[in-house]
Amino acid sequence: MGLLSEFKAFAVKGNVVDMAVGIIIGAAFGKIVSSFVGDVIMPPIGLLIGGVDFSDLAITLKAAEGDVPAVVLAYGKFIQTVLDFVIVAFAIFMGVKAINRLKREEAVAPSEPPVPSAEETLLTEIRDLLKAQQNKS
């Protein structure tokens, strides 16, 4: 099997395609969460604690000199990134929890007993007839 045909067989497998779709959706979800945290969550929090814009919070380690930019420790962006992570982790946790609950409900649901075969039905009838004859005597 040639290299190209092996690659084609690998690339069109369901798991690889599903994984690629998951990665793309995950990246888009990450952007949505980042926007949600930066544009919706952080401004009210900043307002509540005195009008602070978290994205601007930083400690200047070395001031800018000429063409050399300042060296800063941007801890406000780090706080936003941590909040992004917490929200994504919580969303994934809730999704996994819901899937696990569905799996448990599916496993707990009682399955119907198998329908007896014609042979089993016949043997049951014979047994019942023999018991009935035995009880008469």
Swiss-Prot record:
Pfam families in alphabetical order: MscL
GO terms classed as biological process: monoatomic ion transport
Transmembrane segments: 9-29, 79-99
Record bears the keyword Cell membrane: yes
Membrane topology, record value: Multi-pass membrane protein
Cellular component per GO, a single term: membrane
Signal sequence residues: none
Localization terms from the record: Cell inner membrane
Record-level Gene Ontology MF annotations: mechanosensitive monoatomic ion channel activity
Keywords carried by this UniProt record: Cell inner membrane, Cell membrane, Ion channel, Ion transport, Membrane, Transmembrane, Transmembrane helix, Transport
InterPro entries linked: Mechanosensitive_channel_CS, MS_channel, MSC/AndL, MscL_channel
Source organism superkingdom: Bacteria
Family: Belongs to the MscL family.
Assembly description: Homopentamer.
NCBIfam families, sorted: mscL (TIGR00220), PRK00567.1-4 (NF001843)
Function summary: Channel that opens in response to stretch forces in the membrane lipid bilayer. May participate in the regulation of osmotic pressure changes within the cell.
Name of the protein in its database record: Large-conductance mechanosensitive channel
Taxonomic source organism: Pseudomonas aeruginosa (strain ATCC 15692 / DSM 22644 / CIP 104116 / JCM 14847 / LMG 12228 / 1C / PRS 101 / PAO1)
